Amino acid sequence: MNGITVEIRPDGRLSKNGLRRANWQESRQLIAQAREDGFVLGRIEMDDSWETPDQASVSIVQYYARQPFDFDGLACAVAPTIDGLVDCGILADDDPAHIVRYELSHCKVKTMAENRVTITVRPILGP
């Protein structure tokens, strides 16, 4: 098992600052949609050989053309998608006992069309 990568374009309203400014009903709908998207994308990427690991590494890379999210905003924006990956069985849970390595990074791209966020889940095999 190498890992599973899903690619999303998170709504800026899901960032920490965006959620703070948004109406609670709008936020609830955005979160539910992002979670469902994570579930569907996870199912698309999962194959029959995938076994839900007890412990995993999660790597998040934001590809941005103009201004990147702050790391706390990026973590907040992808949280519902990660919940969807838990729902579909890619991750056992999203607590520290199951996600033992969590990496965030940015990568500059040339055009707005290239803006995206990738979430890669890799199993951590036991000793």
What is each PLM-predicted segment?
Residues 1-127:
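Catalytic phosphate/metal-binding cores of nucleic-acid and nucleotide-processing enzymes, i.e., regions
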